Structures are given as C-alpha cells and as structure tokens.
C-alpha cells in the first residue's frame, strides 16, 4: 500500500501485516532463544507489545522503513539475511565462531533502542507540515525520550529486564552499524594485533543490516514510482477528456460527468 504524505508518499503496512510480523518475531524468539533468558525476552516484548508492533525503523521517507510497523519488518529481514550471510561465509571457509542463537539474538536487538525507553516512544509523528513536505520527515525524535544512542539504549533495556548477553552478542550489537557510528571506529580501525576483533559476528550482522536497508529503500522507491506513474496516467486521461471541449456538443459523451469521475479518482472525495 501507499500512503500519501505532505512531502510525498510512503510505504504502509496493513494492520494484518503488522500483526503477522509481530507474531513472526515472537516465533523467532521462541525458536532461537534458549535458557532462562527466553522468558525474560518474551516479557520485555509483552510489556511493550504495542510499541514494538507500531515502531518505525527510521524517521525520513527516503530512509528505510519510515512507516508504522517498519521496525519489526526490518528486524525480521535482518535475522533472515544474517543466517543467509553466515551460510555464505561457511561455504567459503570463513571463520564462524559463534552460535546461531548469538547471531539471531544480536540481529533481533541491534536496533532495540529505536523502540524508546521504558516510558516513551523514540519516534513520534512529525506535526510540522513544512518539515514533512520539504524534508520528508514522517517522524521525529521524541523530546520526552532522554538522549542515548540507539545502541546504548538497547543495552539499557536488556539490562533492565535482566537479560544476559554473551561477549560476542555485545560486540555484534555494538558494531552492527559498522563505520556509520563514530563510536565504532576504535573497534574497527585498530592497528595493533592484540586489539583486533576476534570474532566475525559483527561483520555478518553489518552486511545483513546494510542489505536489509537497501532492499527496504528499493521497495519504497518502487512504490513511489508506481504511484507516480499511475497519477501521471490519470492526469493524462483528464486532459484528454477536457480537450473534448473543442468538439461539437453533440459529439461529446457527457464530458462533465467523465471529468468529474476522473477528478474524483485522482484526488478523492471533494466533500
């Protein structure tokens, strides 16, 4: 679906798709997370269920999944691609020194901070029409949500629910954004052998996250192009009908009604 905004269009998930994605995420947790922490993870998702379900993955229409439900949609894609990238690495004799649980847990929670803190959403709708129209800001950061980096807030939420993580999960979550996060440079640009990273989990997660973002960006672009093409065709049809005014009256086929019908189709109910 496409939703028109003051600044353009955006992809939109239906209520059914949002519910289905959330159910898939819970099933993924049930399948891959083990031990005592599974129940703690499930409690966190139950406590903030509505916020998890509705959270967008980003704020601007030209970013990835700037739509309600975009967060979970993105997380599911990163989980799927992480497992596929790991398989590709294995096929090429690359080092795999982590479990599937560590990989999936990290993929699920790498953007956890985008849900917000314990009381407030991270993103709220942008109510400034100028910024929506001219800057494509569908959402904006919630001023009630105390500043933390997305990654730091993820760790804060996990510790609040007493959810333990392994060292590899910590590194994986910390470095999923790669060099796009300034704080990651000290991990990724080490020139001393003893300081170099000792796992590959972060590289696989970063590749999966980047791939997911590119896919989501393409889906948004294709949706916009499709609606623009359809709109162009509707305008073309209206122009053709209006040009019939040059014809003799008896040659016209109720131009007023046809023009009105096409106008309504393009711009909606005028009432």
Residue ranges and their predicted role:
Residues 33-38, 53, 181, 216-219, ...:
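Residue-level signal for secondary-structure boundary elements
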Residues 221-222, 230, 234:
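Positively charged, structured surface patches that bind polyanionic biopolymers
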Residues 20, 24-31, 39, 43-47, ...:
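Charged/polar, solvent-exposed surface patches and flexible loops
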Residues 62-68, 73, 96-221:
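Divalent metal-dependent catalytic cores for phosphoryl transfer on phosphate-bearing substrates
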Residues 3-133:
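Acidic/His-rich, divalent-metal-binding segments that scaffold phosphate/diphosphate chemistry
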Residues 235-271:
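Short linear clamp-binding motif
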């Amino acid at each position: 679906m496409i939703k028109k905004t003051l600044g353009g269009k955006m992809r939109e998930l239906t209520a059914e798709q949002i519910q289905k994605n959330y159910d898939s995420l819970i099933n993924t947790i049930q399948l891959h997370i083990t031990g005592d922490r599974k129940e703690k993870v499930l409690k966190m998702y139950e406590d903030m269920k509505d916020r998890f379900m509705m959270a967008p993955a980003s704020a601007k229409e030209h970013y990835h999944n700037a739509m309600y439900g975009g967060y979970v949609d993105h997380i599911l894609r990163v989980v799927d691609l992480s497992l596929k990238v790991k398989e590709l690495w294995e096929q090429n004799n690359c080092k795999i020194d982590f479990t599937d649980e560590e990989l999936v847990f990290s993929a699920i929670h790498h953007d956890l901070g985008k849900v917000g803190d314990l009381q407030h959403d991270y993103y709220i709708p942008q109510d400034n029409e100028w910024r929506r129209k001219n800057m494509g800001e569908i959402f904006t950061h919630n001023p009630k949500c105390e500043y933390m980096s997305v990654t730091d807030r993820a760790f804060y939420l996990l510790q609040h629910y007493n959810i333990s993580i392994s060292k590899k999960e910590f590194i994986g979550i910390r470095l999923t954004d790669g060099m796009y996060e300034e704080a990651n440079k000290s991990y990724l640009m080490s020139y001393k052998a003893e300081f170099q990273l000792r796992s590959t989990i972060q590289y696989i997660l970063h590749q999966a996250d980047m791939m997911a973002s590119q896919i989501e960006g393409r889906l948004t672009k294709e949706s916009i192009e499709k609606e623009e093409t359809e709109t162009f065709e509707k305008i073309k049809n209206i122009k053709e009908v209006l040009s019939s005014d040059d014809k003799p009256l008896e040659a016209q086929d109720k131009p007023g009604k046809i023009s009105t019908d096409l106008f309504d189709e393009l711009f909606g109910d005028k009432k």
